[in-house]
A protein has these predicted regions:
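Hydrophobic/aromatic residues within well-ordered alpha-helical segments
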Residues: 18, 61, 72, 76, ...
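Amphipathic alpha-helical segments used for helix-helix packing
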Residues: 93, 105-124, 141, 174, ...
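Hydrophobic alpha-helical connector segments
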Residues: 67, 81-107, 161-165, 208-209
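N-terminal intrinsically disordered/low-complexity leader segments
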Residues: 1-17, 203-227
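Hydrophobic alpha-helical segments that form the core
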Residues: 101-102, 155-174, 186-198
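Conserved hydrophobic residue
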Residues: 35-36, 149, 153
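Amphipathic alpha-helical packing segments from all-alpha helical-bundle domains
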Residues: 71-77, 104, 124-150, 159-163, ...
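Helix-turn-helix
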Residues: 17, 21, 25, 29-63, ...
Length: 227
């Protein structure tokens, strides 16, 4: 007769599903109250299990936070890689990546990157997560640099542009409310329009050059005063 416990792969899948449920609920509470104000008792209560049950899936609260932030960062990395793999103009890839970024930071694990972050964790864990963040920054820099080279993005410092984009998009995860008047899609549309319009190259674009001097990009002829 078949084992009532199921096959080994089935048991592994069930355990993974339950572990993700633990992490997701913990992320929700971290986002609501902060890491230090959250207890494992609250996580267990919301899951309708005992606290000792949690230790079958996680070691401690530090591990939970690390995994929550790590999942969020992995999803951002996968989304950006997917958009880049689609090809096309760098500005189009960048806008698509920004849209995916907003979608993820308004979800439980992505929001946890912003609201809880890696600061409460031990140094080794912080270093790992910050190296993942650095990779996301490199994606943005490369796209901006490519866009400048192909002419779809205005001449600017790719590092500053990448920091500006990532900072603005990440902060959405701080102030976003699921019960707010705007959906993640609507927020993404408005924020990306503001950010991307500042990047798109145009004949009347003015950029800030080295030393803070402005460089006019306008190609239209100046009108000669009459009268």
């Amino acid at each position: 007769m078949p084992s009532p416990w199921g096959t080994a792969p089935e048991r592994a899948q069930l355990r993974a599903s339950k572990r993700e449920a633990v992490l997701r609920v913990a992320a929700q509470i971290f986002n609501e109250k902060g890491f230090h104000a959250t207890s494992l008792d609250e996580v267990a209560e919301r899951l309708h299990v005992t606290k000792p049950t949690l230790y079958y899936y996680v070691k401690n609260k530090d591990e939970i936070l690390f995994e929550c932030v790590n999942i969020g960062l992995q999803r951002l990395e996968e989304a950006i890689r997917r958009e880049r793999a689609g090809g096309g103009r760098a500005i189009d890839q960048l806008v698509a990546a920004m849209r995916s970024y907003v979608e993820i930071v308004t979800q439980d694990f992505g929001m946890c990157i912003i609201r809880a972050g890696e600061d409460p964790l031990p140094a080794q864990s912080r270093r790992k997560l910050r190296s993942f963040k650095a990779q996301l920054d490199r994606h943005f820099r490369e796209l901006v640099r490519q866009g400048i080279e192909e002419g779809s993005i205005a001449d600017c410092d790719p590092k500053i542009a990448a920091f500006t984009l990532a900072g603005a998009l990440s902060w959405i995860g701080r102030w976003y409310r699921p019960d707010g008047p705007l959906s993640p899609e609507e927020i993404a549309q408005q924020c990306i329009a503001l950010l991307a319009n500042g990047l798109c190259a145009g004949r009347t674009r003015t950029c800030i050059g080295a030393g803070g001097k402005t460089r006019a990009k306008a190609s239209a002829k100046k009108k000669t005063p009459t009268g």
